[in-house]
Amino acid sequence: MCQNREHHREGWLALSGLVSAGLALPVAPSAWHGPEVAAILAVAAIALLAGQRWAVAVIVLAQLCLLPTVWPRAVLGAGGSPRLIALATLTAIIPGVLAMPRAAVALAAMTGHDQTERICRCTHVCLLAIGVFAVLAPLL
């Protein structure tokens, strides 16, 4: 039962990764490294669908890297379809932000550290710091 629920959450995370990657591509060409990050996000989402657990960390990092590209267009951009696409992309990024604790565990495992509570907490704090920087970077 618990394993089925976890598989269901990973499916939603992979689906949101594919959707946010697809939606970010029309917005991304005028921004910094947007297409590259969207491509990495799409590949990681497909890897997660194939059962690769490390892809959770890559999806979360890629979605955090898409934030500086997308949120200014959603909040500060001109109206019309580009703004709606940016808002839909931000909505699709939400499951990745909510998966940060699982990404912290996956990152701790990828680096070869023991998955102690302290290491996972520090990794989670680092992911949160990256998220804050990603939100503030366009304002600098």
Please tell me what each predicted stretch does:
Residues 1-140:
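Topology signature of small-to-medium multi-pass alpha-helical membrane proteins
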